[in-house]
From Swiss-Prot:
Family listed: Belongs to the peptidase M17 family.
Species of origin: Rickettsia bellii (strain OSU 85-389)
Residues engaged in binding Mn(2+) 1: D270, D347, E349
Gene name, Swiss-Prot/TrEMBL: pepA
Subcellular location field: Cytoplasm
Cofactor note: Binds 2 manganese ions per subunit.
Protein name as it appears in the record: Probable cytosol aminopeptidase
Length: 502
């Protein structure tokens, strides 16, 4: 993990110094002094607008002409219009800086920031820049044994001086704890499915959360059978690896205060079962457990901060595999709620896992609200692409709060429709419901949401986040490499902190 330290200006001792310049290209007195120390290098660079214009996100690394001293490079970072800067933009700028200096093989970087930028104090800006750099420093290359040393390069340290280092440190320490939740989510999601079997995944959850005073229970197939979880167990019955239900209970306030329940789909690998998927890109189905990973990452972020809230996380961990024991299209399963479901397509398995998991969470913990997170449907990818996750909810206020939190951390949600017509589409001729709609190709995300909605008890606020399009990316972003994004951790942490702290 990138080492970040807030220190006094005279203690800065780094190979590169970051310089913020907006699109007006005017240097304040501090930058004029720095420019003079470096023989006009900054002013000469910005005078040539072909080299640097100050637009947001532009990074220009220039070697220092001063032979003495530690600073070998100046890193010009464009702010664009200061009036348009947001927390998201500042944080992403930190990520862009880290990525550029990593490519330039610069081991230590420094930043001096004493003045306000737009509406933000220097300590606030510094914490956001450091947070973005930290998130962007993430790597998952432990299985790459032939990497050249040059390709293993990482930035070692980030030294920052502000007008209030104590405040900057306090702000950043919170963001660092959240990043640890994001990194766990990315790590476990990126793991190959042969490495993260349900048992191994469950053990990793227990190992990290029990150190944070979270009670973790792992239910095996015998316990789930006794509870009547026929839907979840049916999905995993074709696999040699036993299905698990992991229950994470965090009490940060009065035990009588209501719980928030976070429920995650954890399909460790999804072949589609007997309704087998095409082989093209099937390897990406290792990411079909990203909803569960987001729930665990959120529990880490909340518990490590010791937030004064009560939260339970429930994740169903299964493998959807074809075999002689696998569930067949046309099978009928009885859920923990007592309702029955006809499995018309074994590749619509996530909603079956969630049906039993959300019911268990409600029966055991009586939560005020339930939020489930799942890479549930390809239809949501068609609808929203890689920009938004879909948000379905039976409560307008809950949906609005989630959407607001998502905007604040750039994990965007788009409200999607629920309607009685969609609910009618999942009626079955031989069971209480079917696991796919009866109009081929129509409203697949909404019918999936309605399936889950049938397991939400009266009076419980509920939201379903379909993250299939945003959970993993085939290209890098400002805050991380391609692969698992860690989507949902920062969104849910922000939502919980803004709405449920006692």
């Amino acid at each position: 993990m990138l080492h970040v330290n807030f220190t006094e200006e005279e203690s800065l001792n780094t190979q590169a110094l970051i310089v913020f310049i907006d699109d007006k290209l005017k240097l304040d007195s501090e930058l004029i002094n720095l420019d003079q120390q470096h023989h006009g290098l900054i002013s000469k660079t910005i005078a040539n607008k072909l080299q640097f214009t100050g637009k947001y996100g532009q990074i220009k690394i220039i070697p220092s002409v001063v032979k003495s001293g530690e600073v070998k490079y100046l890193v010009l970072a464009g702010l664009g219009s200061e009036e348009k800067l947001t927390e998201v933009k500042i944080e992403e700028l930190g990520g862009k800086i880290l990525q550029n200096v990593t490519n330039a093989k610069i081991a230590t970087i420094g930043l001096k920031i004493k003045n306000r930028i737009s509406n933000f104090t220097s300590s606030h800006v510094a914490s956001l820049i450091a947070s973005g750099a930290l998130l962007a420093s993430y790597r998952f290359d432990k299985y790459r044994t032939t990497l050249k040393e040059a390709d293993k390069f990482v930035v070692e340290s980030f030294e920052i001086s502000t007008d209030n280092n104590a405040e900057a440190t306090k702000l950043f320490e919170v963001k660092k704890l959240i990043a640890e939740g994001v990194f766990f989510t990315r790590d476990i999601s990126n793991e190959p499915s042969n490495i993260k079997t349900p048992q191994i995944y469950a053990e990793r959850i227990a190992d990290i959360l029990e150190e944070l005073n979270v009670d973790v229970s792992i239910l095996g197939e015998r316990e789930m059978k006794n509870l009547g979880m026929g839907a979840l167990l049916g999905v995993g019955q074709g696999s040699q690896n036993e299905s698990k239900l992991v229950v994470m209970e965090y009490q940060g306030t009065n035990k009588d205060a209501p719980y928030i329940a976070l429920v995650g789909k954890g399909v460790i690998f999804d072949t589609g079962g007997i309704s087998l998927k095409p082989s093209n890109n099937m390897h990406l189905m290792r990411y079909d457990m990203c909803g569960s990973a987001a729930v665990v990452g959120t529990m880490i972020a909340v518990a490590s901060q010791e937030l004064p809230v009560n939260i339970v996380g429930v994740v169903g961990l299964v493998e959807n595999m074809p075999s002689g024991n696998a569930q067949r299209p046309g099978d009928v399963v009885t859920t923990m709620s007592g309702q029955t479901a006809e499995v018309l397509n074994t590749d619509a398995e996530g909603r079956l896992v969630l049906a039993d998991a959300v019911w268990y969470a409600q029966e055991k913990f009586k939560p005020k609200c339930v939020i489930d997170v799942a890479t549930l449907t390809g239809a949501i990818v068609v609808s929203l692409g890689p920009t938004y996750a879909g948000c379905f909810s039976n409560n307008d206020e809950l949906a609005d709060k989630l959407i607001k939190a998502g905007e604040e951390v750039n994990e965007k949600l788009w409200r999607m429709p629920l309607h009685e017509d969609y609910d009618a589409m999942i009626n079955s001729d031989i069971a209480d419901m079917a696991n796919i709609g009866n109009v081929p190709g129509a409203a697949g995300s909404s019918t999936a949401a309605h399936f889950i909605k049938r397991f939400i008890q009266e009076g419980v606020e509920w939201a379903h986040l379909d993250i299939a399009g945003v959970a993993n990316s085939n290209k890098p972003s400002s805050l991380g490499p391609k692969g698992a994004v860690g989507y949902g951790v920062r969104l849910l942490e922000k939502f919980i902190k803004e709405n449920y702290e006692q």
